[in-house]
Amino acid sequence: MIDMLVLRLPFIDSLVCSRLSGNDLIAFVDLSKIATLSGMNLSARTVEYHIDGDLTVSGLSHPFESLPTHYSGIAFKIYEGSKNFYPCVEIKASPAKVLQGHNVFGTTDLALCSEALLLNFANSLPCLYDLLDVNATTISRIDATFSARAPNENIAKQVIDHLRNVSNGQTKSTRSQNWESTVTWNETSRHRTLVAYLKHVELQHQIQQLSSKPSAKMTSYQKEQLKVLSNPDLLEFASGLVRFEARIETRYLKSFGLPLNLFDAIRFASDYNRQGKDLIFDLWSFSFSELFKAFEGDSMNIYDDSAVLDAIQSKHFTITPSGKTSFAKASRYFGFYRRLVNEGYDSVALTMPRNSFWRYVSALVECGIPKSQLMNLSTCNNVVPLVRFINVDFSSQRPDWYNEPVLKIA
C-alpha cells in the first residue's frame, strides 16, 4: 500500500521572482505577498519596534501546519525557494489514514491517494490552492509498505531482533534509529530508507495515545480515528504482522523510470498496472531487493513460548493503585525461563544464588510447568530458514472484508 505520499505544488509563474546568488539564479516568492493573498499566518525570525510605533519584521517563514480531514491530518508547509528548492507548497500525509482512518492495510492506487491529498487541501485552503500551478505538481516521496505474517507477536518480535544484524551491499542497518520493535536501514540516504517494524505494537501505541486524551480536547477526526483503530477485527489482523516499509525518494523513483510529475506518474501507473502488474509493489520490491538477497540461506533460532508467557502472566500479576494490571514479576519469571532454554538448567543453576534459583523454579512450577520439562528445555530443533518468516504474500495483504476506500472531504 501507499503509506506516505509527499507532493510539492509550485507557485504560478506570475508570483515567482528570481535573484542572483553568486553564480546561481534563485527562484523565490515574496512570502508577505503570499500571506496577504492566501490569508496564511507566517513566523518572523526578527521583530523590531520603533519609537514612532512602526513594526519591522524580517526572516519570514512558514512552519508546518496540519489540515484536518475526516480521519487524519495533512501536513503542509510553504517554501519561499532556495538554491535547491523551487518555491512551492509541500503537502504530505498517509493516504491510508486520510481515506480510512488507519494504515494497517490500504490501497496502491496512486490516483486515489493523490486525490485524497489534493482535494482535501483545496477544500481547506482554496485561496492558497489558487496560487499554485497544480498541473506541475511533483512527487517528492512515496512510502510503499507491505507485510509478512509471523504465527504470533512473540515470533514477530524475534524476527525484528534477528533483522538488526542483517545488511547487504549498500544497505546498512542504522543502529541509532533502531528501537525495540523497529529496525531501520540507510536512514540518511537520499535514495531510499528501509524500515521493518511490528504493526500491532504501533497500533496499540496509537490507541493508547488517543485514549489518554480527554474527550473534550479531542478533535473530531481523532475521535473518528480512535473508533476505527479500536475495531477488534483490525487488531486481530495486525497481530503478527512484520511491516517492511520503503521510503522512496525522487532519485530512486527516477531510477525505476517513474516520472516525477504527478499526473504523468498517474498515467504511467495506469499503463503499468494494465499489464497485470502493480507499480507500488514492484517499487517496493525494487527497493528491498538488495536486502532480501541477504535473507537467502540465513536462518534464525525461533522459540514459540507464547503459551508459557500466558500461563505465567495468568498466575503472577499485581493490580497497581491506579487500577492497572502490572506484569513486572511475570516478565522476570519469563526471562528466567528463557535463560533455561538458552543456557540449560544446570548452567543457570550454577550461575545464580541457590535461593533465588529455587524460588524462580517454584514460581514456574506454580504456573503448571513441570520441573522435568524445565530440566530438559532445548533450542536445538528450532533453527528455521529466515525466509520462512519473511514471506510477503501480495495476495494476502488485506483481509477478506476489505473494500477499496471512498474519498471523504472534511
Swiss-Prot record:
Q: What does this protein do?
A: Isoform G2P plays an essential role in viral DNA replication. Binds the origin of replication and cleaves the dsDNA replicative form I (RFI) and becomes covalently bound to it via phosphotyrosine bond, generating the dsDNA replicative form II (RFII). In turn, viral DNA replication initiates at the 3'-OH of the cleavage site. After one round of rolling circle synthesis, protein G2P is linked to the newly synthesized ssDNA and joins the ends of the displaced strand to generate a circular single-stranded molecule ready to be packed into a virion.
Give the gene that encodes this protein: II
Q: Name one GO biological process term.
A: rolling circle single-stranded viral DNA replication
Going by the UniProt record, its keywords in alphabetical order are:
DNA replication, DNA-binding, Endonuclease, Formylation, Hydrolase, Ligase, Nuclease
Q: List the disulfide bonds.
A: none
Give the protein's recorded name. Answer: Replication-associated protein G2P
Query: Native species of this protein?
Result: Enterobacteria phage fd (Bacteriophage fd)
Q: Give the reaction(s) catalysed.
A: ATP + (deoxyribonucleotide)n-3'-hydroxyl + 5'-phospho-(deoxyribonucleotide)m = (deoxyribonucleotide)n+m + AMP + diphosphate
Pfam families to which the protein is assigned, alphabetical: G2P_X_C, Phage_CRI
Does Ligase appear among the keywords? yes
Q: Which family does it belong to?
A: Belongs to the inovirus G2P protein family.
InterPro entries, per the entry: G2P, G2P_C, G2P_N
One annotated GO molecular function is: DNA binding
Task: Name the EC number(s).
Answer: 3.1.21.-, 6.5.1.1
